[in-house]
Amino acid sequence: MEFSTKALDLSKAGQNGFLATKTDCLVVGLFEGQSLAGVAKALDVATKGLVARLVKQGDFEGKRGTQLMLHEVAGVGAARVLLVGLGKEADFNDKAFAEAVRTATRALGGTRAASALWCLVQQPPQQRDVAWAIITTITLVREAGYRLLERHPELKRAPRGAGANEKASLRKIVLAVDVGDAKAASQAAVRGTAIANGMELTRDLGNLPSNICTPTYLANTARGIAKRHKLKVEILGRKQIEALNMGAFLAVTKGSVEPPQFIVLRYDGASAKQAPVVLVGKGITFDTGGISLKPGEGMDEMKYDMCGAASVLGTIQAVAEMGLKQNVIAVVPTCENMPSGIATKPGDVVTSMSGQTIEILNTDAEGRLILCDALTYVERFKPAAVIDVATLTGACIIALGHVNSGLYARSDALADQLLGAGRKAMDTAWRLPLDDDYQDQLKSNFADMANIGGRPAGSVTAACFLARYTEKYDWAHLDIAGTAWKSGAAKGATGRPVPLLTQFLMDRAA
């Protein structure tokens, strides 16, 4: 879908102004119980009081979540006019704005409209600007229009006659802004499109079946990103991983015939003097649990155990598309976790790249094993900050459900930056404790530590395990087990936390 911006002069709204624009649909927002203003007022004047009459007669009151589609309206160039309720202006917050965007998108999806002049972004919530409104609009509209089978048609044979009676899909949206916002709006459209592209890549990688999206597939995806955006890429295979003494990572790979990959993708957007932000993504392309085998029911969803990897690849692609003035490195350890005659067994002791030994009490706590070696590896970059992203624990889902990602950080400053970015991007996280007292649960009689700490505070002890490998830099951990994908009728990857991560990086580059 193509997005562009157009500056409006409300003083020229009539026959020769923006309302004369030829388009399939004009989208206009109305507040509940307010006098008409802005575009709504201009539309009312051009249509000789039509909008005011609709409000007065009770046909459309501007209530939140409502819409009214009008056809062949005299005085405008659009084939349709869509009125969207914004609710009461005093209550118009981020969620109300998002609801208006989703309401308009659904309404347009029920028509044959292929283009729209979208006049909602001039009315951002308080504390937000037009750039925020544009980025939010683009990501939400693209999110609603995402279909894996359209992006990967090889996965399903089209039925006979497919497409003969299908409605035209929305292909072009022009986002109308005030003249004074034109420059900021243009940059925001580029950024919103980049974030949406990154989210779609992340969703694709998560949704693809594990016989397609293998560690090698992820490595080739990274190569493709590097080629398209002129990034530096390095892919390490098993022999190189062995040479680095990544014993924890290698322990997870033992049961699978799929070769492990260690991906390093580098975007140099700023001076070489700027220390990079490093994003580390867990890339378990299928997780059976290994010898500590998971129950069969729902195991198909373990293809989503690489969503951390998918999200850091989506994020660095978005950053490159934006041309952000920030150095960013994406690091992805990726493999399968499978049972076999040579797989790692409960009770085995391995030596990580850091030299610390680990008693593997549960082979289904494998994400932290591949991450700990990656977190040791990234010390060489002398990073400004490291953020690891992982579908790490079911315990995080029990704690936070499917609304907030779990956030752990030693530094209050880094935690606050990530939490603020999440709120702004409507991709929220909740900070959980990282107290040293929890470390006692990881004690082992046979190694420096165990890889699990028992049932209590399972997400916390997983983060505490990772913390032992991050003492040389500023670090945060995002547990996205509850937010990376949805189950049920709407099953599929969400693209989170790409919005949070990209907003965090945009804020740092500002």
Curated annotation (Swiss-Prot):
Entry's EC annotation: 3.4.11.1, 3.4.11.10
Entry keyword Hydrolase: yes
EC main group: hydrolase
Main location class: cytoplasm
A GO molecular function held by the record: metalloaminopeptidase activity
The entry's keywords: Aminopeptidase, Cytoplasm, Hydrolase, Manganese, Metal-binding, Protease
Taxonomy, superkingdom: Bacteria
Family: Belongs to the peptidase M17 family.
Protein's UniProt name: Probable cytosol aminopeptidase
